[in-house]
Amino acid sequence: MCGFLKALLALAIVGHAAQVTQAADAAPTSPLPPTASAPVSPEELGFDEIVFVKRKPYSSDHYYTDVNNGTSPDRFLPENGIYVYNLRTGRERAVVTAAGMPGGKGFLGKISLSFDARQVVFDFRESPDRGFRVWEVGIDGAGLRQVSFPPDDEARKAARWGRPWHTDDVHPCYLPDGRIIFSSTRCEHTVLCGGSAHLVAPVLHCMAPDGTQIEQLSKSPVSEFCPVVLDDGRVMYHRWEYIDKGARVAKTIWTMNPDGSRPQEIYGLADDTTTVYMYPQPMPGNDHRVVCVGTCHYPQGGCVGAIMLIDAKTGNRARGPDPDEEGYVAFDGRYAVTNVTPHVFIERRTEPGWHFLADDGRYVHDRNGQSGHLYTHPYPVSDREFLVSYKVSPTDHYKDVANAYAIWLIDTDGNHRFVHRDARLSCWHPTPLRARRVPPSIQPVRDAEYAARDRALCVVTNVEHGMQGIERGEVKWLRINEALPRYWDTGRRWEPSLSSSAWKAALWPRVQWGVVPVEEDGSAYFEVPADRSVFFQALDENFRELQRERTYVNYRPGEVRSCNGCHGESGHVVPPVGSEAPLALRRAPSIPQPQPCDLAENGGDGRAGQVIHYPTDVQPIFDAKCVSCHGATDPADGLRLTGEPTLYYSTSYEELARKQLAGPIIPEFTSFLWGDRGNYNGAYLPPKSLGCPTSVLIAVLTDPAHPKNAEDDHSAMLDPWELMIVSRWVDTNYQFYGSYYGRHHWHWVNPDPKVPAYDPADFRRKATFDEAVGMFAPPWHR
């Protein structure tokens, strides 16, 4: 072990917190990590050849924008292609190059080798104005064919987006039954942050070997990437999400069955750092140990960063200290994540860029990647060795040097051994060219009756299991919510406002599908909508939140799924089951029903499904019961609850939000209260941390003993149904708009001569439930 690594480990073991500097002030960059002189031999690795991709780095500006801006025109070269390197002869051969494909100089992204090692499937873009499509070729170069083609409604999709663009199919992978799983923008989702709708959010799809029978497997609101098949037949993949979390956390790793059923987290939901866990690969013979690249949200050149090991069954579900923090220990069994290359890491709060270890022991924050080495695309060849794409020169720019990345073999001791590089282009996705055992083909059983109605069944054996501080029998109801994706057809009618739903809180609107009862033993058995991003809230007898599921699950039509409690993290031990079945299973499954405030006899519309829209749900209650004291002139206690439209929202809403009277705000983007800290908030929160249990507003409206009620008792001001409506809104993380549809900026309160078709009656209009959950905009939105 060289002096560099010994010094690094010494710092780690004593828990030294290295000083962080900016690149301009840094000492000379770190030397090459320890390099073993012994050549890499086929006998050692167990295979003779490596298949890989040659091209320039992506030109992406974010980790999820490869399909948007990752392939600038200078990236399209005839010699881009798939190649095989022979470890015995030291020679390489081309399998296929862009010169022999349509356009003659396209861009190849990611490859996947068939289980028998005879075929390669890959994504290819012919030119900057064409979409990525899935192709296949024999490892001998024969049988080149295009597998996926533009959808029949490609032109209509682009028109809905309102941009001269296209769909993309990327990251293909063979399934055990011969089908191909891939990520695609055919779903017509866009990311939720940013000032425009031009950044797409692909999700997982699958298709038959001939490219037919394309099926969308997920309705995730934001991006899913890089599927890979585990030894047990499940699919592992990357998933970005933020359900009441900051937009820069929760870049997670999940699994699902090949048909999209039973999605389950491997790691990331409680990780409160900015690290993006991309390109996961299972460790040999072990599906709960994963190697991946830990990269940054931005900038990007194809997801480059540090090599990370994750053991989903070991240690704390949150990340441990960074290498520059007190208490850091290399290979610390207290935590699930280990950085194999700690001379580079993604700091938990500083973006953009990477942190590199310099010669003097300081860590350098560098946005250009020119202060150290970068890695990506790890492929495990044993339980301690990995083929990687490696930026050899520490001073090379992370994406502007064409041949910066080569194939190296690294190990858990920090050793680096050269394998292969090209004089002109970088080498990516190194994969052993050898056959693998075909995993079992999982064929989940679905209930045909529920599938026909686009429903699934959920069983909760004891919702109170794992809920600290919740008494037995305290949970009476579950509220079924959907996190809505933002479809291309929504446009950006709220522009220039950043958020479509709330003021620096949720960037997405939620709708309620109804509530279902919880039995005395904590069990529940009920229907849920299929192919929706569903999450639950545990409610008390007054339909107020006790705990919130800050993630979502997609249930496939006819799927039957169970969980053992509202524990907030996967991997918990299932409590022992007694001889008697849960009470909920002794009856028919519950159908989601309206809350009492939504019943027709109580003034509601009688529907279980509800759009939660502050201007029409909450403001009328304030107008009727509150503004006489909390009006525009000398409002009581300095709280003004009038409903005048502000630039994006309203007076009362902004008063409640600024003062956090509806409980703590969980900002999903830069917070007006906390600045950049609003991008995080990913850590697990125990019950009663959000919503009604922490709301001053609800306390004043329900507790006669509250100090605010000493002179003027507000606790009986609202009738039960009004209080229930306000309580439901409080449990939404300050949602203002109930859907993406409609004109939101105050400019649209009046007619606009430039848009004569616009009717001011549609200003901040409340969508119907069916409109809110729909893929296509209602006529009044356009």
What are these regions (language model features)?
Residues 15-21, 109:
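Intrinsically disordered, low-complexity regions enriched in polar/acidic and amide residues
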Residues 24-521, 527, 546-554, 558-562, ...:
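Sequence signature of WD/YWTD-type beta-propeller architectures
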Residues 23-41, 45-47, 77, 437, ...:
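Aromatic- and Gly/Pro-enriched helix-to-coil junctions and flexible linker segments
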Residues 10, 21-24:
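Cleavable N-terminal signal peptides
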Residues 6-16:
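Bacterial N-terminal signal peptides
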